[in-house]
Amino acid sequence: MYVTGNLAGNTIAMVLAGGKGERLAPLTLRRPKPGVAFGGKYKIIDFVLSNMFNSGIKKVYILTQYRAYSLMKHIRESWGKWAGLGEFFVAISPETSSESEEWFKGTADAINHYLRFIESSDADYVAIFGGDHIYRMDVSQMIGYHRRNRADITIAALEVPVEEARRFGVFCVDDDNRVTAFEEKPANPVTIPGRETCFASMGNYIFSTRRLIEVLQEGKKLHADLDFGKHVIPMMLAKKDRVFAYNFNDNLIPGMKPEERGYWKDVGTIDSYYEANMELIHVSPQLNLYNYKWPILTNQGNYPPAKTVFDEDGRRGMNIDSYVCAGCITSGSVVRRSIVGPLTKVNSYSLVEDSILFENVNVGRNVKIRRAIIDKNITIPDGTTIGYDHGEDRRRGYTVTESGIVVVSPAE
């Protein structure tokens, strides 16, 4: 644990991890968005769970839903080790829980399904966070802000330019950052007082426990598809509850450099996902995964180190400007500006450039791959070329984005 305090210890967390992530298809055809690999060895959900753990919050329920099996397996293997001494990271799903056999109809409805876990706790605060974004955050600082303001709900907010704000739910705030109005995807976003930027919701909330229970019980009588953005926040504003915005740019973590402040990625499309991964291999990326004072935790696997083999002209194993995970073998081939997941092998005379290879990919001999994403457990036959002729890529059934990223995934 890297940040401690009674506030974090008096908090339980509910992480919403059931989203389909349809814009990220085909990577989400067999897994939910939080279960998609990121940075080679991680899953997207590892970022929010690491934030909770490093912030001192170790009572965490992960609410899964869509194609939940692989995500639940990952959570058991990566996070189950923290069980005991009143600490837990546990995944629950309508498919596996006797609490409810119905699927969630909205973000707040998901919490309502498991409200008894909150009611039976002695927590003063409940952190409700999404499980499908990439960022670092000390949640205990947001809890402290919530307490100082005697808030009923505090909403994590991105400070974004006006032109970007139209894609988000946007707050109107007073000089104390108390929320006075909220509008989903406004045509004319209202700026923060004294600034030329807007507050956009990150979909992350801190609630005072008693008020959360009350508002969810009230809301479920009115809306079967109860949602925080559409229903709960407007209800609380109408009742004059103390609703505050917490500026994410004010959040500081140990080891953070100034240029890292405010880093947050949605990775909701193939292109944005690809770009966020490729940024990691820059010399000085905005998201520095080598900050050991705030580690991103995951299941390491009992894999041997990565290695390169062969050192002959035309057959020299090389990894250049790349992330290459444990268990990988670059055998007489070249990997350049790429991210290579665990247990992947790139065989002789092949070239992989500007690409993302998931776990256990087998790249045959004399293969050329450029600006592509290769899904887990796929074998690329000898002599295959990917990313050089998009017409041919499409004919083979691969997905090709507008920017030219080729995605090779298993057939449904």
UniProtKB/Swiss-Prot annotation:
Gene3D superfamilies tied to this protein: Hexapeptide repeat proteins, Spore Coat Polysaccharide Biosynthesis Protein SpsA, Chain A
Keyword ATP-binding: yes
GO molecular function: ATP binding; glucose-1-phosphate adenylyltransferase activity
Residues at which alpha-D-glucose 1-phosphate binds: G169, E184, K185, S201
Keywords: ATP-binding, Carbohydrate metabolism, Glycogen biosynthesis, Glycogen metabolism, Nucleotide-binding, Nucleotidyltransferase, Transferase
CDD domains in UniProt: ADP_Glucose_PP, LbH_G1P_AT_C
BP terms from Gene Ontology: glycogen biosynthetic process
EC number: 2.7.7.27
Reactions listed under catalytic activity: alpha-D-glucose 1-phosphate + ATP + H(+) = ADP-alpha-D-glucose + diphosphate
Pathway annotation: Glycan biosynthesis; glycogen biosynthesis
Pfam families, per database record: Hexapep_GlmU, NTP_transferase
Coiled-coil intervals, chain numbering: none
InterPro entries from the UniProt entry: ADP-Glc_PPase, ADP_Glu_pyroP_CS, GlgC_bac, GlmU/GlgC-like_hexapep, NTP_transferase_dom, Nucleotide-diphossugar_trans, Trimer_LpxA-like_sf
Keyword Oxidoreductase annotated: no
Assembly information from the UniProt record: Homotetramer.
Free-text function comment from the UniProt entry: Involved in the biosynthesis of ADP-glucose, a building block required for the elongation reactions to produce glycogen. Catalyzes the reaction between ATP and alpha-D-glucose 1-phosphate (G1P) to produce pyrophosphate and ADP-Glc.
Family (UniProt): Belongs to the bacterial/plant glucose-1-phosphate adenylyltransferase family.
Protein name per the record: Glucose-1-phosphate adenylyltransferase
Species the sequence originates in: Geobacter metallireducens (strain ATCC 53774 / DSM 7210 / GS-15)
